[in-house]
Regions:
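"…together with the soluble PPM/PP2C metallo-phosphatase catalytic core" -> "…together
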Residues: 1-188
């Protein structure tokens, strides 16, 4: 239930602020993962089906949104520009696998709703030092804190819909910041 409330809150945020159209890519990205998580909550999808479905969607999404991808990695305090060493599809594959890794890591702790929620809160606060999507990030923080309050009262739980939704929000934000630092995207 908590994931549904957070998802509806995010959609309402974009509708109220009249920037639904400008953020279509973001909404499609997080909506897909939310729906996979919701279907899993309702019908207990197999883990291989979820993994393959999310892999295919993410890979196709990244192909059609070339500005959103991992461009640099930090290895032993040295920034490595992947564009200098790898072709486009290799970078898309690495980005896809990174998103799925984060998604599954967060999904593994979704049974511990408080830990999952606070991990997302700390991550979003840390990432907001770049001031990208600042307003929506604080709104999402408000939604997560509200969820956490009701979770502590044993009134709601995050579920796979919530963990998939929050992991997609976090991965999109990380990728957007990475792309923006290289000047590949414009601030929204």
């Amino acid at each position: 239930v908590g994931g549904i409330i957070i998802y509806i809150g995010i959609l309402l945020y974009f509708l109220v602020n009249n920037n639904f159209i400008q953020n279509t890519h973001y909404i499609i990205f997080v909506s897909f993962f939310f729906l996979v998580g919701l279907l899993d909550d309702l019908s207990n999808l197999s883990s291989s089906f979820r993994l393959i479905t999310c892999f295919i969607f993410t890979f196709i999404f990244l192909i059609f949104n070339p500005e959103i991808r991992i461009n640099e990695i930090l290895i032993f305090e040295k920034n490595i520009n992947l564009n200098s060493y790898l072709n486009y599809f290799s970078i898309i594959l690495i980005t896809t696998l990174s998103i799925l890794l984060l998604q599954n890591a967060i999904n593994m702790i979704d049974g511990m709703n408080g830990i999952c929620a606070f991990f997302i809160i700390i991550s979003i606060l840390y990432l907001n030092f770049n001031y990208l999507y600042l307003e929506i990030s604080f709104f999402i923080l408000f939604l997560i804190l509200t969820f956490t309050y009701f979770n502590l009262m044993n009134k709601t739980f995050l579920g796979n819909s919530g963990s998939y939704l929050l992991s997609s929000i976090l991965s999109y934000k990380i990728l957007f910041i990475n792309s923006n630092e290289l000047g590949l995207t414009s601030e929204k």
